[in-house]
Structure formats: structure tokens, C-alpha cells
Swiss-Prot record:
It comes from Arabidopsis thaliana (Mouse-ear cress). Observed in flowers. It is found in: Endoplasmic reticulum membrane. GO terms for molecular function: metal ion binding. Residues 1-30 are annotated as: Disordered. The lineage of its organism: Eukaryota, Viridiplantae, Streptophyta, Embryophyta, Tracheophyta. Belongs to the MCTP family. Residues 1-12 have a biased composition (Gly residues). May function as a signaling molecule by regulating the trafficking of other regulators. This is Multiple C2 domain and transmembrane region protein 11. It is a multi-pass membrane protein. Keywords: Calcium, Endoplasmic reticulum, Membrane, Metal-binding, Repeat, Transmembrane, Transmembrane helix.
């Protein structure tokens, strides 16, 4: 894919990162300004707020209130309790720059007469006379206003209203009805609001199944029963292996791991099952309440207990004793429950709050605006986009309000997080809201469309500096990478204690339990899947709900699925790392070939310096690193890293490779497509197999030096070792090293090129176990 474009970005073409100068902090900002006021990372947006509190002495019982200015109109919910003194407690926010009139009207209407010309009463406010209120000023007290009829005559009934000009810093901003989403009505209005979510605290539940005794089989004459344990926690099922002890007293000594969520209201159910052919028959169950399970914070043994196993009849009655099971159950709070990909994690703290250290800083994010968004759907015969942002860091998720029907939405919302480790990543995703115009049941089945995602690693940011950049929003689709627009962000990472932050670089990344009692890769993968499932359920219960599709996209679920594109990208990263070593080897080879006699002579002199003055050699190397690091300070990166399509190989991936990457697991393909992909994977795996075999061969040749597998080679090596011992006893080590270095770098006149050296010839003749491979 050809990518062209211009700009002052750090990437190529339209996918570049651009530095911006937004009007934040009561004026423009330049990269290093340190603004400190509240909401100083966003542009101030002024709103006309109208808070409808209550009404009294209305001449009708079922009423609602409409608030309008110009063509914008919002309305409260209808009060259907036949009450002439209704309570509303709703707030309306009109963007001041888009006001289409000078008079704000608050109109009380009767539910039974929805006619626009038929009103119960109203009151008017001149916009020019409305006061301005900016936090931390106290909220304006609401006042009672007499209602007027259409002719301006005072009538019976009053309404309590508070009206003011404010900004997005107002406390009611997130709960208010906004004029930029006026086309959304009814129960869908809640899906346009901003929201702060907190992830539940998750713990690992460890169930060490030791043994069972006196199990009662359903078939008393059965010989060699195959007993296993099934664990149920919520919707999660974990199976043990079949016990190797084929009796009614089986032994396992196996760990079963679950993810449990506070406040531990659930119960763990263990089912003892006998595998009879393809079926598994339940011999009995045991229920353990999580609230009664011991919580383990530090490494140490947990006492084991015996639990009764009860068999329950098909009707749920007739419980009877079916044996005993020996368990060691604990809630392990010393682990960090991984719900994100480890390389993009935003938190590494243990589950137990007792193990938390004080925060080392504060992260502030200003979500300013987006520009040039692509049409995501069609409404009214034209393309449109209803965009909102979601940001996740640690256990705190934030969601901006939805800006309806615009390709250039302005949010200007600011959020803060406490930082406990600088080696963490904040993730910002942009989505198109598809839950604004459907019915409630329909909305639950709709997935919001992805517009793009940004990751920013805090350790790459200079503390107290404001970064204002426009990030490209990219989505990889089966037909290639596509730019969906740009989002402008302002980010600042402030350290509360520089010493505490520097100390973090000396501490383990994960809590101690991950190293003292490590979990297997399989367990971590299964537990991460469980944690993601719990978060999806928990965040989906809020209003507005964060859908499973949004949560999984933010948590990077599916990142471990095979992708040829990512495999090529990682291979090139590895090659890039070795490029420096390869260049150094080529340079040394040129020294040995004396292509530049002056350089070769200088290297010989340096070699003598290293051999005879090793102390100064180490000193020189450290000094060189120090000076070179200072020199590189002027060339340091000025921008935070961003998604690179060239590094990701997204611009050169073939359609079939992308189609394979987006295929479900297990694959939905069949026939020739699946055969072609399988053959391609076999070719890649075959090359990897050869490389691994070559590495194993070299290692086995080293081991064979003393194995006497080749008696002549071992004899030669032992003779060499014995002679070398004698030489070292009588010849100075410095002279030996000098001779060895000069021999390696000897002049071409005393060297035969293109012929392997004696050590190489000897090493290649050593045996390996490759001869034993079938």
C-alpha cells in the first residue's frame, strides 16, 4: 500500500504523529509549559445549564418539562404518579457557541395534551442576564419561579429552576442532557453520557486437590474407576486430570486456578466425576463459600481440610454421603491478576491492598477532539458517525460523552489517574456509538464499531511536561490498514516523588508471588480469559454500559492468535537488534584482512592497551558510554511513540495473510483456503525446525568434547588441554593473549583466506545427536 502525505509528523504520510498547539490553560501551550490549574489540559467549553428541580401546585397531575432555546429542545421524563408536585432533578446543557436564540424557555406541559400550543405554564430567561459560575465556586441555589401562560399572565403553579453559564468542569456535566445529542431521545439518552467506571478487585482462587476417600460409586461392581474433579465458579468450569490411582480413594495433588471477584458472594462447587466411556457421571458435590476461604497475602502454607461430598438426586432431594475430599483452598492476594496483555499492562499491583505501595505520580489526560473521522454508518440516506472515547489505566475506565452526527467531534474532557509504576501503558480507544436509536433489547445485541486505538507508555514521557499531539487512528481490516481519522490528546505525567519513582526501576515488575510460586503459561492464559469475562460482565451492568466488544478491544483480547504479519514484524525486530553486532563483526573482519592498514595498526595498539592495562580499558569503556549517552541527549526522541504501520508490516501484508489473521479460532475456513494456509505454515515451521536443529547440533558438539563419543576427537582435545596447561604455567597470560589477538588479526600475507581455520574444522567434525533423529 502506497502511503503519501505531508506534515511535521514523525512517521510517513497520513499515518504520522503531529505536534499541536491547542488553546489550553487560558492560552496556547508550547511543549514544555507546566500548567497547574484544574482542567488545564483541555480547551474551555461554555455551556448554558438549566437544572429543573421540582414543581408545585400545578393544575395538572401528569406533567413533564421542556427546555428550549432556538431549535434546541430537551425534555424531562414524564411524571406519571398523578402528583401536582412532581420531582424532576434533571439538568440540560446547551453549547453556548451554538445558541440559536436569546431567550431560554422552561415550559411545563401536560402528558395528555402533547400539542405544542397547549402548555400548562412557562418561564423565560434572558441569556444575557444569566450569571456565570466556574468551579470551585459553590453551585447556584435553585429558585422558585411563577409560571406564566402564553400571554405572559401569571398563573397558579411554580417551578424550581437553576440557570447558569458554566464549563465542562461543572459537577453536573457528566449527567446532563447535551444539545449536541438532541436527536437522541428516551432511554437512549443515557448512552450518550460520560462515565467513570471502576474495575472490581480480582483475586486468584487456588484449589489444591489432594485426594479423596471412601467415594461411593454409582456402579458398585465397577473396577478401576477414572475419577476426576470439576470446579465451577460462576460460568467458569475447570477440570482436573484423571487420577492415576484407579480406586475409590484417588490421589491428584493438583492445583485448579480460578479468578474470584470481591466481595466474594459466590460459592465454589466441586463435582467428583467418574468417566465411564464418553460420559462423566457425577458421584457427588461439595460447596465452599468464598467468604469463608482463607485469604493468603504472603507466601506460606495453607492448612488443608476435609470436606464431605454429597450425592444429590435428580429431583434435588435425597442428599446422602458420597465420600470425602481433601483440599487446600486459598484466595491468593499476593498475585496481580492479569487482565491485559503483559507488555501493554497498566497496573502491576497485587490484589491485596495491604501490599500496595504509595503512588509515585499522577497521570492527566485531556481528550480534546477528533478530526476527519470516516463515516461509520448510514442514517437518513447519508453517512454519519457518533463518536466517543474510552480510556483505561489501572482499574479506572473513563468514557467521554457521545458527540452525535459529526466527523469532527469536540470532547474537551480531562481525567486523572494515580500512577504506581512508570512502566505502564494508558490505552485510549475511539468508537462509533450504535446504541442511540434502537430499542433497549436491540441495543444489547449491537456492537459498537471500532475507529482506532492509541497506546502511550508513561516511562517514555518527561515528567511534568505537557504533550499535545494529534494521533492517527488506524484500524486493520481484512482489506488492509485504513486511517479512520485523527484524535488530539494532551498528556502530562507528574511525579510526586522522584526518588520513589527511580526506586521503582530496581524493583521486580510483578509482585513477589509471581516469582516465588510462578504460574504456568497455560494457567496465566486461562486466568486472563476468566478475568476478561468477569470485567465484561461487570462493566456491562453500568449505565451507559461498556459492551463486551469495547472491553475486549481495550484489553487486546486475541493478541496471541497466530498472525503471519506480526511474526514477520517480530522477526525484523530481532534482525534489527543483531544488525549492530553483525556490522561490528564485518568491521573486525575488515581489520583482519587489513583493508585499511592504518586502522588495523591502531587496533593492534588498542589490543596491547587492553591486555597490559585492563583496568584503564574498563575505565575507558565506561567513560565512552557516559560521553556517548550525553551526546545522544541532544538526539533524544521528542514525541511519545505511536502505532507504526511500517514496523507492524500493516502496509505490506497480503490480503490472504490479513484474512487469516481475522479468521476465528477454530478456523471457519475449509477446502483449498485452509490447505494453502496449512502448507504455508508448514513451510515456516520447517525453516524454524531447521534453525532449531542447527542450534541444538552446535550445543551437542560442545558437550561431545568430553563424552568420548568420538574417541579420537576427545583424545585430541584432552591433549590440547594438557599442553595448554603446561604453556600457561611457563608463559605469561598477557603474552598469550597478545599472541592470540595478533594471530587472529595477522596480515594477509601469512593467511590463507576462504579456508576454514583449524578450530573450525575440528568443531565441525564433532558428533551430535542429529544422527539419532529418525
Amino acid at each position: 500500500m502506497a502511503v503519501n502525505g505531508t506534515g511535521n509528523g514523525t512517521g510517513d504520510g497520513d499515518f504520522s504523529l503531529k505536534e499541536t498547539s491547542p488553546n489550553i490553560g487560558n492560552g496556547g501551550v508550547n511543549g514544555g509549559e507546566k500548567l497547574t490549574s484544574s482542567f488545564d489540559l483541555v480547551e474551555a467549553m461554555h455551556f448554558l445549564y438549566a437544572r429543573i428541580v421540582r414543581a408545585r401546585a400545578l393544575p395538572v397531575n401528569d406533567s413533564f418539562v421542556a427546555v428550549k432555546i432556538g431549535s434546541y429542545k430537551g425534555r424531562t421524563k414524564q411524571i406519571l404518579n398523578s402528583n401536582p408536585n412532581p420531582e424532576f432533578h434533571e439538568t440540560f446543557a446547551f453549547t453556548k457557541t451554538r445558541l440559536q436564540g436569546d431567550i431560554l424557555e422552561v415550559v411545563v406541559r401536560n402528558r395528555d395534551n402533547p400539542n405544542e400550543d397547549d402548555i400548562v405554564g412557562k418561564c423565560k430567561f434572558d441569556v444575557a442576564e444569566i450569571p456565570t459560575r466556574v468551579p470551585p465556586d459553590s453551585p447556584l441555589a435553585p429558585q422558585w419561579y411563577r409560571l406564566e401562560d402564553r400571554n405572559g399572565v401569571k398563573i397558579g403553579g411554580e417551578i424550581m429552576v437553576s440557570v447558569w453559564i458554566g464549563t465542562q468542569a461543572d459537577e453536573v456535566f457528566s449527567e446532563a442532557w447535551h444539545s449536541d445529542s438532541a436527536s437522541v431521545t428516551g432511554e437512549n439518552v443515557v448512552n450518550t453520557r460520560s462515565k467513570v467506571y471502576l474495575s472490581p478487585r480480582l483475586w486468584y482462587l487456588r484449589v489444591n486437590v489432594i485426594e479423596a476417600q471412601d467415594l461411593v460409586l454409582l456402579h458398585p461392581n465397577r473396577i478401576n474407576p477414572e475419577i476426576l474433579i470439576k470446579g465451577f465458579l460462576g460460568n467458569v468450569v475447570v477440570r482436573s486430570r484423571i487420577s492415576q490411582t484407579k480406586s475409590v480413594s484417588p490421589v491428584w495433588n493438583e492445583d485448579m486456578m480460578f479468578v474470584a471477584v470481591e466481595p466474594f458472594d459466590d460459592s465454589l462447587i466441586l463435582s467428583v466425576e467418574d468417566k465411564v466411556g464418553p460420559r462423566e457421571e457425577c458421584l457427588g458435590r461439595c460447596e465452599i463459600k468464598l467468604s469463608q476461604v482463607e485469604r493468603r497475602v504472603l507466601p506460606g502454607p495453607v492448612p488443608s481440610l476435609w470436606y464431605n461430598v454429597e450425592h444429590i438426586g435428580e429431583t434435588g432431594e435425597g442428599r446422602r454421603f458420597a465420600g470425602r475430599i481433601h483440599l487446600r483452598v486459598s484466595l491468593d492476594g499476593g498475585y496481580h491478576v492479569l487482565d491485559e496483555s503483559i507488555q501493554y499492562s497498566s497496573d502491576y499491583r497485587a490484589s491485596a491492598k495491604l501490599l500496595w505501595t504509595p503512588p509515585i505520580g499522577v497521570l492527566e489526560l485531556g481528550v480534546l477532539n477528533a478530526t476527519g473521522l470516516m463515516p461509520m454508518k448510514s442514517r437518513g440516506g447519508r453517512g454519519t458517525t457518533d463518536a466517543y472515547c474510552v480510556a483505561k489505566y489501572g482499574t479506572k475506565w473513563v468514557r467521554t460523552r457521545t458527540i452525535v452526527d459529526t466527523f469532527d467531534p469536540k470532547w474537551n474532557e480531562q481525567y486523572t489517574w494515580e500512577v504506581y509504576d512508570p512502566y505502564t501503558v494508558i490505552t485510549i480507544g475511539v468508537f462509533d456509538n450504535l446504541k442511540l436509536f434502537g430499542a433497549g433489547n436491540e441495543n444489547r445485541l449491537i456492537n459498537d464499531s471500532r475507529i482506532g486505538k492509541i497506546r502511550i507508555r508513561l516511562s517514555t514521557l518527561v515528567t511534568s511536561k505537557i504533550y499535545t499531539h494529534s494521533y492517527p487512528l488506524m484500524v486493520l481490516k481484512p482489506d488492509g490498514v485504513k486511517k479512520m481519522g485523527e484524535i488530539q490528546l494532551a498528556v502530562r505525567f507528574t511525579a510526586t516523588s522522584m526518588m520513589d519513582m527511580l526506586q521503582k526501576y530496581t524493583e521486580p515488575l510483578l509482585p513477589e508471588m509471581h516469582y516465588i510460586s510462578p504460574l504456568s503459561i497455560y494457567q496465566l492464559d486461562s486466568l486472563r480469559h476468566q478475568a476478561t469475562h468477569i470485567l465484561c460482565i461487570n462493566l456491562g451492568r453500568n449505565e451507559p454500559a461498556l459492551g463486551r466488544d469495547v472491553v475486549e478491544y481495550m484489553l487486546d483480547v486475541g493478541s496471541n492468535i497466530w498472525s503471519l504479519r506480526r511474526g514477520r514484524a517480530n522477526f525484523e525486530r530481532l534482525v534489527s537488534f543483531f544488525d549492530g553486532w553483525i556490522d561490528a563483526w564485518k568491521w573486525f573482519d575488515e581489520i583482519c584482512k587489513w583493508k585499511s592498514p592504518v586502522t588495523s595498526v591502531l587496533v593492534h595498539i588498542v589490543c596491547l592497551f587492553v591486555v597490559f592495562l585492563p583496568k584503564y580499558c574498563v575505565f575507558s569503556m565506561l567513560l565512552y558510554c557516559f560521553v556517548f549517552g550525553l551526546y545522544r541527549f541532544g538526539l533524544r526522541p521528542r514525541h511519545p511513540p505511536h502505532m507504526d504501520i511500517k514496523l507492524s508490516k500493516a502496509d505490506s501484508a497480503l490480503p490472504d495473510e490479513l484474512d487469516e489473521e481475522f479468521d476465528v479460532f477454530p478456523s471457519s475456513k475449509s477446502g483449498d483456503v485452509l490447505k494453502r494456509r496449512y502448507d504455508r505454515l508448514r513451510g515456516i515451521a520447517g525453516r524454524m525446525m531447521i534453525v532449531l536443529g542447527d542450534l541444538a547440533t552446535q550445543g551437542e558438539r560442545v558437550k561431545s568434547l568430553l563424552s568420548w563419543r568420538d574417541p579420537r576427537a576427545t583424545s585430541l582435545f584432552l591433549t590440547f588441554c594438557f599442553v595448554s596447561c603446561g604453556v600457561i604455567c611457563f608463559v605469561s597470560m598477557k603474552l598469550l593473549l597478545t599472541f592470540l589477538a595478533f594471530y587472529v588479526m595477522r596480515h594477509p600475507r601469512v593467511r590463507v583466506f576462504d579456508i576454514p581455520s583449524i578450530p573450525q574444522n575440528f568443531f565441525r567434525r564433532l558428533p551430535s545427536r542429529a544422527d539419532s533423529i529418525l
